[in-house]
Each structure stands twice: as C-alpha cells, then as structure tokens.
Regions:
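Phosphate-binding active sites in nucleotide-utilizing proteins
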Residues: 279-382
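PAPS-dependent sulfotransferases, especially Golgi type II membrane carbohydrate sulfotransferases
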Residues: 165, 186, 198-209, 219-285, ...
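Conserved alpha-helical positions within TPR/SEL1-like repeat arrays
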Residues: 17, 21, 44-55, 78-89, ...
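Alpha-helical segment of the N-proximal tetratricopeptide repeat
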Residues: 8-38, 48-51, 55
Length: 523
C-alpha cells in the first residue's frame, strides 16, 4: 500500500472514529463497509462494523462480520476476541470460550481475552477459573481500574477477604476518585469504634466535586459502618441520604411500568389450565425465588452443598429470555396466544432454555437463586413441569429494610431507593405470590426464613425431601464448603446462621416510615 493510500485510510478512519464516539452507529457501519471494499485486510474496519452492531443490539450481524474477518485474518487477536464476545452475547458460551482461548494461543498476553474469559467463567459460577483469568489480567496490567475491581469482586466471592482488601487499598491509592472501592470495602469489613476506614470516608464525603453516584457510594458505605457500630442515628441519617441521592441517578424512572407488568402476568394466567401441561421436563432444575434479601442466598448455599447439585447463583437465563420476548404489547400477546398454547412451540422453548442451564453442568441438578424469577413462576410451570420452586418467605418488612440499606449492582431497581416505591413493590410481590400459590398450590414450596434459621437441620431435611434429594451433612455445614457468592450477602454466607436477623426491622419503624406500609405477614 503506497503512502497516499495510507494517508487516505487514516483520514477516513479518523472520520469513522468520530462517528463512533458520537454514537452514529448506522453511519459507522455504512462508511466502514465502503472502506472494506477497498481495504479488505484491515482488522480495524471489521471491528468498527462489529462493535457498532453490538451497540445496536444486532449480535447476529456482528457475528457474521467477525466470522468473515476470521476468514481473511485468522490470526488477528482483536478479531478472534470480538468473535468470542459475539458468541457470548448470543449465549453460545462454548463457542465464546473457544474463541477467547484461540486468541490467547495467538497472544497469551491479550488482556481483553483474559478479562472476557473471567466474565464468562464467572457467569457459569466457575469461580476458580474466573479468578485465574482475572489474576492473569492483573499480572498483565495492575494499573487498570477495571481489572482491579474485577479482582476484588472475584476474591470477595471466594471469601478471600484479606486479599480483596489489599487490592481495594491498591485501588484507593491508584484511583483515589473511585468511590466504588469504599462501598466494596464496607461489604467485607466489620467496623469497630474509631475505625480508620470510616474516618477516611467521613473526611471526603463533603467534597463538592463528587457526583450523585460517588455520593451514594460513600453514604451507603458510611451507613454500613455506623450500622456495625450500632449507632442508629448516624446509620439512619446516611441511609436516607444514600437512597435519596441514588434515586436521582434513575432519570425519568416510571414505577407504573412495574405495576403494569405485574397486572399483565396475573391477567394472562388467571384462567390458564396448567394441568394440560404434561411434558416431563425440568427434573434437573431448582429455582429459589423471593424478594432480594429474603434468604435466597442461604437456601442456595444449603442446597448447592449437596453432592448432586450445582449452584448457579443468580442466573439471568430466565429473566433475559422473557425480557427479550416481552419487548412490546404485541410480542406479549403473541407469546401468550400462540407460543404458550402450542405444544411444539413450548417444547422448543423449554429445550432452548434448558440447553443454557446445561452449560453450568450437564450431570448435576442446577440451582438458580435469581430472586426475581418469582415473576415467571407460571412460565416455569409451563415449560418445566417437573422443576422445583422454593419460595424464600421472610417477613417482608425485614426484607424491605435490608433492601433499603444496601446498594445493588442491577441497573433497573429504581424502586429499591425510594421508600414509597419500595413499599409498593413489596406489596406487588406479595399479591403475585399469593396469586401463584392459589393457582399452583404445592408446586411451590414455602421455606420460611424464620423457621430455617431457628431450626436449620429440621427445615433443611424438609427442603431436600421436596427436591427429591437425600439428606447430606454438607448441607447443614455449608459454611465449610467453597461455594462462591457474588451477591450482597457475600460476607454473611461465610458465617453461621444467626437468629438476630429475625424481626430486624422492628426497631426501625419510627425511622423509616415506609415499613409501616408493608404487610407484616409474608404471603
């Protein structure tokens, strides 16, 4: 290629880059495809097209362009890695893993591939493999903010809190403006009076340059420190501030959309005849559902400690599937009117979902503790009649109190940071669970959190019997097992069951008015 061509290509790619930064992705694709005809061996052009398709949520199109690029540039690391990402976005994790490994065969120091393999193994709850890849990424570049955070989360999930704290301090030193580090530290630290970490947070909370996200991170972490110290007034003050500020980050939040979703579900299942669904699918699936902070993690640790089960943690398989199906009113009506009542269509859907669960482990019973699957119980009954559903039933005021004093990584939980919406959401959940119990009866096992922590052995035996599993001592001694946890309960699951969590909200009714709006009795 002569100098004129190189100069021309550089100018054109600069224009494409500007369009990409402006999020003009269709124009990026159009202009890049024109360039591709003249320069078919330039990896960066394929990457611009594929990455733009990612941004437009056209993952199949992205995969097509990256597979074409593989034919022309079979040893280009960026192409191989992006092909893996395309497969991962399409839930083909086996092919994704193969391409990430191909990248590392070409370039063992390819940082994005180590990170993506870490994410992939993390999604499959293969915590040791994930940790290895994050550690490799750390060894390649320990000055990367995201790499440090991934290592912290991975070590915390494994219960390696001392190692996690060391990297958090490293993150503090290298990226002092990152307030996420304070929140991460607070989750795995028990604060005592005059704790230096608390003093550090208090010294920067009034910095005028902090944005809403930074302020909420700090207030949640400070609230946790005062909660540990049993300083109720300061705990309440910072909890209120944390939630007030966090809610401001949810622009144009519309709670009515939540209410509509709940009503739609009940409407479509009101007169549905479940007994007609005879297909024998789901024997190797256990779903633990309930509100967040209702004891789902405890149940997951207990059941996943059994030799015949594999704990998938909070899998997004079910929720992602239905959220894609229900993009608009027409797609919802079509799903209920056509696919759900068509035996062949139902069988195809259940096989599609089941194949994704089998990626965790083909030989064991998969335990999915995504709490929000309570919304999809009717569908689970339809698609997996032999599955087991366990409802973690805790005093809803206790769950709500715990929700309000914690921050969640999930982006769509605006209701969790507003007292009025939180109370309404809990009551929506209660009504929907009552609806499912009325319609499905013993298909749902009610595990009462208060009974479980009061008599763990007796309740564990009942739960295992419902799951058609023999009792094993490991299920009672679950804290001795190395089952990873990536949820807010990451610190608590390493401790023995504690009864002090029962009626924990009672002393806070005067501080948080929304607790009075929640029905005392669980559904």
């Amino acid at each position: 290629m002569n100098n004129i061509n190189i100069s021309f290509l550089k100018k054109e790619l600069d224009r494409v880059n500007i369009l990409f930064k402006k999020k003009e992705f269709n124009l990026v694709i159009q202009k890049s495809k024109t360039l591709l005809k003249k320069y078919p061996n330039q990896a960066i052009i394929y990457n611009y097209i594929g990455l733009s398709y990612f941004q437009l949520d056209k993952n199949k199109k992205a995969l097509e362009i990256f597979l074409l690029a593989n034919e022309r540039l079979p040893l280009e690391p960026s192409i191989l890695c992006n092909t893996g990402i395309a497969y991962k976005n399409l839930d083909d994790l086996i092919s994704a893993r193969n391409y990430f490994n191909k990248t590392l065969n070409v370039n063992p120091k390819h940082l994005p591939s180590h990170i993506n393999l870490g994410h992939l193994e993390n999604n499959l709850n293969h915590s040791d493999l994930a940790a290895d890849h994050y550690l490799n990424a750390y060894n390649l570049n320990n000055n990367s903010e995201e790499v440090l955070i991934y290592c912290i989360l991975s070590l915390s999930a494994q219960g390696k809190f001392c190692e996690a704290k060391k990297i958090i301090l490293e993150l503090n030193n290298k990226f002092p403006k990152n307030t996420k580090s304070y929140q991460l530290y607070s989750k795995i630290h028990k604060y005592k009076v005059n704790d230096p970490h608390q003093r550090l947070m208090l010294s920067i909370i009034n910095n005028p340059n902090l944005d809403y996200e930074d302020l909420s991170n700090l207030h949640f972490a400070i609230a946790k420190s005062f909660y540990d110290q049993k300083n109720i007034n300061e705990f309440v003050h910072h909890t209120l501030k944390a939630n007030e500020i966090k809610f401001k980050t949810f622009n144009d939040y519309n709670f009515e959309l939540e209410e509509v979703k709940f009503e739609q579900i009940k409407k479509h299942f009101e007169n549905f005849h479940f007994q007609h669904q005879k297909e024998n699918k789901g024997e190797k699936l256990i779903f633990i559902v309930g509100l967040p902070r209702s004891g789902t993690t405890l149940l997951h640790q207990i059941i996943s400690s059994h030799s015949k089960t594999f704990g998938a943690e909070e899998s997004h398989i079910i929720s992602d599937f239905f959220n894609k199906k229900f993009k608009n009113e027409n797609s919802i009506i079509n799903f209920y009117s056509n696919e759900l009542v068509n035996k062949d269509a139902c069988s195809k859907l259940s096989s599609e979902i089941l194949s994704k669960y089998e990626m965790y482990d083909q030989n064991k019973i998969i335990v999915d503790k995504m709490p929000f699957n309570f919304k999809w119980i009717g569908f689970i009954k339809m698609l997996f009649p032999q599955a087991k559903i366990i409802h973690s039933n805790r005093n809803p005021a206790d769950s709500a109190f715990s929700i309000y004093r914690n921050v969640f990584d999930s982006p769509g939980l605006g209701w969790a940071y507003n007292q009025n919406y939180l109370a309404k959401y809990v009551n929506l959940y209660s009504h929907l669970m009552s609806f499912w119990k009325q319609r499905l009866g013993n298909f749902i096992y009610e595990s009462h959190y208060e009974k479980l922590v009061s008599d763990q052995v007796k309740e564990t035996k009942k739960i295992l019997k419902f799951c058609n599993l023999e009792f094993e001592d490991s299920c009672v001694n679950y804290t001795k097992n190395n089952i990873p946890s990536r949820t807010i309960s990451v610190f608590q699951v390493r401790d023995e069951v504690y009864k002090s969590s029962i009626n924990l909200s009672d002393k806070y009714f005067n501080y948080f008015p929304f607790l009075n709006q929640i029905k005392k009795k669980a559904p």
